[in-house]
Amino acid sequence: MRTRTPVPFKNQLISAVVAGLLPVCASAGKDDNTLVVAFEKPLTTVDRLYSIQREGLILSRLTDDGLFYVNPDSLEFEPLAAESYEWINETTLEVTVRDDVFFHDGSKLTAEDVVYTFEWVLDENSDTSRGPVIQSWLESIEKAGPRTVRFNLRLPYPMALRDMAISIPVRKKGTYEGADGMENAAEDRPLNGIGPYRIKDFSAGREIVIERFDNYYQASPKANPAIETMVFRVIPDQGTQQAELLSGGIDMMMGVPPDVADNISHLPGVERKEGNDIRIGYITLDAAGYSDPDTPFTKLKVRQAINHAINREEITRYLVRGSAEVVPYACHPRQFGCEGDGPVYPYNPEKAKRLLKEAGYPDGFAFKLWAYREKIIAEAVVSDLKEIGLDVDLRFVKLNVFAKVRNDKDMEAFFASYGSGGTADASASTGVHFAAGSARNYTDDEALGETVLAAERTIEVAERKRLYREALNRIAEQAYWVPMFSYSQNYLLSPGLEFPVPKDGVPRFWQASWSDQ
C-alpha cells in the first residue's frame, strides 16, 4: 500500500469559506481568564458515577477527586484524596484519608464519606455505570480508624487503584439518599465534588460552566490551577467547531482528524498540538472458527500470511500520521506489561503469498472484513490483501451493528480500535480481548485465557510482567491478531493557550494556562 492521502475537497472548501468570511478575533477567554472548549458529544449528567463518556471523564478530573489519580507524567496510580495506603495482604487494602479536603459546599471530607461512596457503588440498586465492575472484585468497605478505611476484596485484583482513580469520585454521605439527597442520581443538577473546580452552571446537552474552587487542598498535584473559569460547549459538527475557533467563539478543539488539522492549522489565530493516545488499532482473525468451522483463518499459516500482507508502516505514516506508531503486540507500548519478545511480522507480500500456498490456498479465498471506523484505513487494508490474491468484501457498518455481529461471533475478520479507558496497563487491552468468555476473543485458546486471568489475579509486579509476556508471545506466535498502530491526537488551540499534551489522550485542563504574550 503506497498512498499519500490528499486533503478532501470538502475540508478545503470549509476552511476556505471559514477563513474568508470569519474574522480572526482575540481568544474566547484570555482577557477574562476563561477557557472555552468544544465537546463533540453531549453530557446528560455531570456525575461520573453515572457516565462512561470520555467527556465525562475529562470533566470529572476537574470537578471531582478520587482516592487516587493517574499521574500525567508516569501514568501510574498515586494517592490523591488518600494520604497513604497499604496492602495488608493480597485482598485487604487500607487507605488513610487526607484531613485537609473540603467538598464544594464547605464540609470536610471524612472516612464516612468514603465508606458511603463505595457502599453506594456496591449496592446493585444504585445502577452506577461501573458498579458491576467494582462489585466483581470488592466485597465490602469499612471504617477502620478516624481517617482510615479498609477495602475487603473478593480476590487479588491489581487494578483496584485504577478503578478508584478513574471510576469512583468521592461523594458526600447522603448525596443520593433522603430529603437532602437526589431522587434521580443522574438528573440535571450539579453535584458536590472535591475537585479543583466546581459546577457553576449545567445545561444538559448544551453547556457546562465550572469555576475554580478556592478552598481546594494545597497538597494536591492539581492545586492552584491558573484558569479561573472553564466553559464546555457542545458543538457536534466539526465544521462549526472550526468556524467558532477561527472567530474566537472557542479556544480549543479536541480529537481533530489529521486532514482537518493540516488544513486549518496554518491559518492565523490557530495553533496545533499533537499527542499520544493509549488507543490502538488492530485486526482480529477468527482462529476459533466461530463464524464458520471451515474458515481459512483457523489455519496458522493463513493468519501469518495476513500479518505479512498488510503494510502497517505506510498506513501508520500516511493515514494515521502524527505521533502514531506501529505496535508489534496486542497492547499499547506504554502500557504496563506490554513487553513481548515473540515473533513480529514485517511487511512481505511475497512471503504472504507463499504462506497462503502452503496453507492450501494458492489462488486465495474470499471473505468479509468488518469495520466501523476509519474507512480509509480499512480500504487500505483491503487493497493490501487483494495484492496477495484475496477477495475481500469490506463491510463498513455503524458501531451498534458491528458490536452485535461481533458479539454473536459471526465475523471472520474485523478491523477495530480500543482505547483501554486511558489505562496504561495491559489488563485493559490484552486482558479485555483475550479473557475467556470475552465477546472480543475469537481464539478459543483456554491456556491463553488462563494466563491473562492469572495476570489479573496477582498484585506481584514481576509475576504480572511474566504472565503478560507469556500471553503476548502466545498471541504473536499464533497470529491471532494483526496489531496495527497507536493513535495520535490532534488539538487546535487559540494563540497564547498553554496546554501540556497528555500522554494517554485524556486532557488535564487544570494544567492549562494563558501566556502573558
Locations of regions flagged by a protein language model:
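Gly/Pro-rich hinge or "lid" segments in bacterial periplasmic/extracellular proteins
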Residues: 71-72, 165-225, 229-231, 349-350, ...
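Detector for C-terminal structural segments
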Residues: 43, 203, 207, 276-281, ...
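Surface-exposed binding/hinge segments that line
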Residues: 4, 10, 86, 132-176, ...
